[in-house]
């Protein structure tokens, strides 16, 4: 404790000794020298302080009334007295909404339901219930040719292939020329029936598989932010 007290006393004495020359100079100096030192110091940032003790005639007209007060104040103090503009408080959930409208189209408020439906009057709307029937009819039309061709080829092969006797089946008796030609035509008809069957399966698969949209989509119209300016200003 004694060491701390001695250290504190020495610090206080050092501060007093350092401040004594300043007090002595201030006591011996005149008023003019004191004011000049204060003006030259950096305390007022190069601005002259207000001398309330000395009367001045600045700002006094011939009638003896003060026209305006001539006081030099610090810039920081002047700014502190000015009214501050507080920023507008906005809720965090509120976001700025930007409305877009197509070029050449009126605003959303002016567009009515009649205008919307007028654009689609030329289109033929098919109910959902008839879509299945139409799809089934299309499938039947696609499978008509393969079905007829396969049936005709099968019956032709059945008629063209000759009936062999027991000796011909065992190989004891050779086939005649007509039987050989009929056998060849019969196998050709069977091949045609198989081809028609493959055609029908292919058309069925293509009918139920997802189709690729090969038609080109129309170019999207450029969206322009809705504002009070004209369309030409928006293009620029």
UniProtKB/Swiss-Prot annotation:
One of its GO terms (biological process) is symbiont-mediated generation of symbiont replication vacuole. Residues 223-236 have a biased composition (Acidic residues). It is a single-pass membrane protein. Residues 1-26 form the signal peptide. Residues 45-106, 208-236 are annotated as: Disordered. InterPro entries: Dense_granule_Gra7_protein. Its main location: secreted. Glycans are attached at residue 213. Residues 70-80 have a biased composition (Polar residues). Disruption phenotype: Gene knockout has no significant effects on parasite growth rates in cell culture. Reduced parasite growth in nutrient-depleted media with increased vacuolization and loss of organelles. Increased frequency of parasitophorous vacuoles loaded with mouse immunity-related GTPases (IRGs). Reduced levels of mouse IRGA6/IIGP1 phosphorylation following Toxoplasma gondii infection. Reduced virulence in mice. Significantly reduced virulence in mice in double knockout with ROP18. The keyword Secreted applies. Keywords: Cytoplasm, Cytoplasmic vesicle, Glycoprotein, Host cytoplasm, Membrane, Secreted, Signal, Transmembrane, Transmembrane helix. Mice immunized against the protein produce specific antibodies, show predominant Th1-type immune profile in response to vaccination and survive longer after Toxoplasma challenge. Homodimer. Can form higher order homooligomers in a lipid-stimulated manner. Component of a complex at least composed of ROP18, GRA7 and ROP2. Interacts with ROP5. Interacts with ROP18 in the absence of ROP5. Interacts with mouse IRGA6/IIGP1 in GTP-dependent manner; the interaction results in faster turnover of the GTP-activated IRGA6/IIGP1 oligomer. Interacts with mouse TRAF6 (via N-terminal RING domain); the interaction plays a role in GRA7-induced pro-inflammatory cytokine production in mouse macrophages. Belongs to the Gra7 family. Binds lipid bilayers, sequesters host endocytic organelles in the parasitophorous vacuole space, and causes their deformation and remodeling. Plays a role in nutrient acquisition from the host. In complex with ROP18, targets immunity-related GTPases (IRGs) to prevent IRG-mediated parasite killing by mouse cells. Important component within a kinase complex, contributing to phosphorylation of mouse IRGA6/IIGP1, an immunity-related GTPase that protects mice from infection by certain intracellular pathogens, by Toxoplasma gondii ROP5 and ROP18. This is Dense granule protein 7. It comes from Toxoplasma gondii.
């Amino acid at each position: 404790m004694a060491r701390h007290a001695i250290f504190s006393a020495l610090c206080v004495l050092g501060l007093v000794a350092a401040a004594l020359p300043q007090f002595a100079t201030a006591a011996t100096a005149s008023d003019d020298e004191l004011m000049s030192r204060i003006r030259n110091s950096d305390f007022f940032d190069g601005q002259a302080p207000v001398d309330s003790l000395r009367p001045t005639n600045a700002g006094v007209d011939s009638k003896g009334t003060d026209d305006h007060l001539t006081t030099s104040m610090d810039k920081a103090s002047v700014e502190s007295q000015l009214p501050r503009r507080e920023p507008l408080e906005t809720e965090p959930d509120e976001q700025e909404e930007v409305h877009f409208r197509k070029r050449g189209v009126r605003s959303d408020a002016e567009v009515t339901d009649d205008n919307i439906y007028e654009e689609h009057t030329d289109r033929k709307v098919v109910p959902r219930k008839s879509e299945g029937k139409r799809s089934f009819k299309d499938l039947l039309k696609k499978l008509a040719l393969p079905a007829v061709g396969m049936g005709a080829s099968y019956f032709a092969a059945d008629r063209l292939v000759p009936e062999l006797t027991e000796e011909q089946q065992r190989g004891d008796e050779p086939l005649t020329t007509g039987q050989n030609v009929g056998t060849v035509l019969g196998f050709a008809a069977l091949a045609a029936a198989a081809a028609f069957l493959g055609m029908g399966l292919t058309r069925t698969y293509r009918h139920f598989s997802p189709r690729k949209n090969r038609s080109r989509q129309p170019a999207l119209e450029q969206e322009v932010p809705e504002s009070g300016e004209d369309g030409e200003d928006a293009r620029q």
